[in-house]
UniProtKB/Swiss-Prot annotation:
One GO MF term attached to the UniProt entry: single-stranded DNA binding
Primary gene name: priB
Source organism (scientific name): Pectobacterium atrosepticum (strain SCRI 1043 / ATCC BAA-672) (Erwinia carotovora subsp. atroseptica)
InterPro entries in the record: NA-bd_OB-fold, Primosome_PriB/ssb, Prisomal_replication_PriB
Protein name according to UniProt: Replication restart protein PriB
GO cellular component: primosome complex
Pfam families on file: SSB_1
Assembly behavior: Homodimer. Interacts with PriA and DnaT. Component of the replication restart primosome. Primosome assembly occurs via a 'hand-off' mechanism. PriA binds to replication forks, subsequently PriB then DnaT bind; DnaT then displaces ssDNA to generate the helicase loading substrate.
SUPFAM superfamilies, per database record: Nucleic acid-binding proteins (SSF50249)
Role summary: Involved in the restart of stalled replication forks, which reloads the replicative helicase on sites other than the origin of replication; the PriA-PriB pathway is the major replication restart pathway. During primosome assembly it facilitates complex formation between PriA and DnaT on DNA; stabilizes PriA on DNA. Stimulates the DNA unwinding activity of PriA helicase.
Amino acid sequence: MVTMNRLVLSGTVCKTPIRKVSPSGIPHCQFVLEHRSTQEEAGLSRQAWCRMPVIVSGLSSQAVTHSITVGTQLTVHGFISCHQGRNGLSKIVLHAEQIELIDSGD
């Protein structure tokens, strides 16, 4: 059985983070990360772009989430999983295990 599930994605927070606490007392922070880059594929440059929903769960990860706002640049390390929305549609979500703030140089 193959069990590798790792994703590292950098980008800019493009939707206001939503902070909630589950009924079991676990804090969660949800936001959307927009990624834009130039990648090489088959020897040619191409533009890569995506918007990835991110969820950060647990007490130990919440300290960094308080400084996250729209426009914050981040690198997120974690794993992906499928979440089903109320509308019945499934979407891929990045579950953050490590978040690094990117210094904008200002």
